[in-house]
């Protein structure tokens, strides 16, 4: 990634944040007559980041981001495991059973922590042992779904680097960094389900051996969460690549999810080791299926 492209990404991110802040101030400065003539754009209850959102228990679908807000000063810890020692699509039943369905094998693990540094604004850091990748990201929860808004919207920016956030990978090859920018859109369907659309653009997804036209990937993540009990959900997502570098298959995942207080646990079936935005852009190997889990804990 060139210095110019990284600077452009940072400029876009700051512009998005400043635009949201300026818009909020402009609404606050409306005249009393205007306030009496029109209902507020967002009620206090809609704007409460700590409000329980029964159909949105976690900050991810499986790997894709949601629009769940985080109260200012609060935090959230997220752990993912993908057991890659057994491939459920290629290995026979005896191999799968003898390896305890994959739990005996090695795992791709990601640790993530996010904190709300301002109202509606989250800072996130994640580290996975897949390529020793570290990802820094920010999320601005611009719109909360409620009585005055038919959907939720969050803006996302990130940058990640392999080999503990270096420009060289674990083999010593200079591959640069992979910044991303996108949005997460959410919509509740009554009291039963929520759906997500996450268009995301990632730069530098094919840094080795490709022409300039293959250096970027644009994908649109699609997700759904269906409630089958008061705090139990069936979850699914897919991340089809629309343009740019598109190796292998699109990432797909399914999960059975349970919320208990501030904890969320998901038993996951997924076709990729990917958890970061650039890894999702690079897709999955054909005929691959792993078992794993997600575990999250809110601190508020």
Identify the residue ranges that each predicted region occupies:
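Charged helix-capping and loop-helix junction motifs
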Residues: 214-220, 249-252
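Surface loops at the rim/top face of extracytoplasmic beta-rich domains
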Residues: 212-213, 222, 227-229
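N-terminal secretory signal peptides that target proteins for export/translocation
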Residues: 1-7
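Bacterial N-terminal signal peptides
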Residues: 10-21
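Transmembrane beta-barrel domains of Gram-negative outer membranes and organellar outer membranes
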Residues: 30-170, 176-182, 186-205, 226-229, ...
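Short helix-loop boundary/capping segments
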Residues: 195, 209-214
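Signal peptide processing junction and immediate N-terminal pro/mature segment
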Residues: 20-33
């Amino acid at each position: 990634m060139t210095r110019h492209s990284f600077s452009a990404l940072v400029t876009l991110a700051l512009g998005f944040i400043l635009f949201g802040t300026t818009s909020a101030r402009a609404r606050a400065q409306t005249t009393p007559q205007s306030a009496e003539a029109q209902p507020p754009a967002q009620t206090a209850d809609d704007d409460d980041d700590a409000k329980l959102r029964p159909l949105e228990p976690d900050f991810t679908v499986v790997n894709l981001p949601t629009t769940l807000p985080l109260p200012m000063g609060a935090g959230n810890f997220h752990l993912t495991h993908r057991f890659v020692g057994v491939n459920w699509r290629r290995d026979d039943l005896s191999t799968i059973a003898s390896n305890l369905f994959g739990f005996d094998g090695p795992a791709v693990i990601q640790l993530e922590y996010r904190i709300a540094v301002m109202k509606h604004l989250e800072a996130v850091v994640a580290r996975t042992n897949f390529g020793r990748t570290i990802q820094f990201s920010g999320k601005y929860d611009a719109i909360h779904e409620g009585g005055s808004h038919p959907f939720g919207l969050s803006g996302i920016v990130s940058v990640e680097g392999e080999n503990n956030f270096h420009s060289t990978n674990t083999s010593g090859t200079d591959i640069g960094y992979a910044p991303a920018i996108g949005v997460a859109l959410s919509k509740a369907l009554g009291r039963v389900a929520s759906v997500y659309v996450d268009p995301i653009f990632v730069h530098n997804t094919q840094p080795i051996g490709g022409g300039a036209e293959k250096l970027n990937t644009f994908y649109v993540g699609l997700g759904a969460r269906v409630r089958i009990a008061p705090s139990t959900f069936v979850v699914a997502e897919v991340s089809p690549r629309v343009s740019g570098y598109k190796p292998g298959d699109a990432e797909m995942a399914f999960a059975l999810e349970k919320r208990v207080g501030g904890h969320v646990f998901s038993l996951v079936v997924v076709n990729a080791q990917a958890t970061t935005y650039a890894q999702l852009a690079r897709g999955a190997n054909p005929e691959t299926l792993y078992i794993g889990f997600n575990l999250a804990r809110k601190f508020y």
